[in-house]
Amino acid sequence: MATEKQQDNWIKEGRGQGYLKNYKPWVTVRDFGSKGRSHRVYGHTTKRTHHLLSDLELATFLLLDWNPSVTDIREQFPLPLQATTQIAEQAQITHPRVRNALQIMSSDFYVDRKDFRQPNFA
């Protein structure tokens, strides 16, 4: 979880923005200490290093990276704060906060594909 100041800095850094080799993940393996395993892996599809926070993310990434229909892989993709607060409100659950600052949540992956029927998925 990040403080409001950290989140503001990440936005200024351009995290969660860009495509292919210019994409910057919202969260990197260096941002937080972890009790689990994290990985920094080069992606052949995107031509950049990906920040993966678990072995399961690594396994998923490897399947995506070698799939010929995948055109872009963005990991730790930030979700719109307005949308996640609305979902939490509708579900009557508390949206994550740190020091009373709402947290920008992220999806493990946001993937673009050549398939016109389902060109994107998270």
Q: What residues fall within each predicted segment?
A:
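A structured, charge-rich N-terminal accessory region that forms the first stable segment of a protein
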Residues: M1-L81
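Active-site metal-binding core of divalent-cation-utilizing nuclease and nuclease-like domains
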Residues: E75-P119
